[in-house]
């Protein structure tokens, strides 16, 4: 059995097949892969707001995470000899621990789009995003990021 939590969405879309091929190579017939990772729409309000902030400045916002649907990912699993026994895409609003939770989340998990950018500009874009999303994601003194997760339980059959 191979178990994975919150890893696959960090791997580029063009490397997903290689990932699954390698997992399949390391399981015997009947072996299971159980995984959960970011699914289509994960943190979309944050990414959309950042994208608007970049565009306002004539910059392109790179979407660096891979967030598929069940329908997009199941064929990859099937191609490498897995039978999908369970698959679900679901909302999982995720509370951030501090009042600065959204800024902290952006700085911790979404650094790549800001690489090479002047820190003052980074802060300006983040501040705009925080203010734009405050009414939507700041609830009862806590930031709640709009996570969407995808979960699979698959079994190798060939």
Residue spans for each PLM region:
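A short glycine-rich, Lys/Arg-flanked "PGG" loop and its adjoining helix->strand segment in the class I
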Residues: 17-32
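C-terminal helical/coil "lid" or tail adjacent to the Rossmann-like core of SAM-dependent
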Residues: 85-140
